[in-house]
Amino acid sequence: MPKEIILPEGTPPPLAPYVPATKADNIVYVSGILPLDENNDVVHVGDAAAQTRHVLETIKHILSNAGGSLKDVTFNHIFLRDWADYPAINQVYAEYFPEERPARYCVQVGLVKPDALIEIASVAHV
């Protein structure tokens, strides 16, 4: 099965040996996206809602480059640093997925960047 590497312009360089997304058989696998700028610095430090918005906008950009959109997302893997941020994250998340929401799970973890409050990885069928 051939795969296509998705490297959208403007996304930060990966922090490890991975790519922002791969596409195979019309399925796009988006790597865990952190709230990072083009220099891999965390944006909106301390603001879970703004970080969530940044992450979802990045995922939207990646999916667009793969020929899809957020409407094509079938599963999200959500990693958050603190359960106290869960309501703010969900409020923003609901704006991006108002109807026909994808399946998801959400777990509390330590993230690779200490100031990051959220990371989301997605699967989309385009």
Swiss-Prot record:
Its EC number is 3.5.-.-. One of its GO terms (biological process) is uracil catabolic process. One of its GO terms (cellular component) is cytosol. It catalyses: (Z)-3-aminoacrylate + H2O + H(+) = 3-oxopropanoate + NH4(+). One of its GO terms (molecular function) is deaminase activity. It comes from the Bacteria. Keywords: Hydrolase. It is an enzyme of class 3 (hydrolase). Involved in pyrimidine catabolism. Catalyzes the deamination of 3-aminoacrylate to malonic semialdehyde, a reaction that can also occur spontaneously. RutC may facilitate the reaction and modulate the metabolic fitness, rather than catalyzing essential functions. HAMAP family: RutC. Belongs to the RutC family. This is 3-aminoacrylate deaminase RutC. It comes from Acinetobacter baylyi (strain ATCC 33305 / BD413 / ADP1).
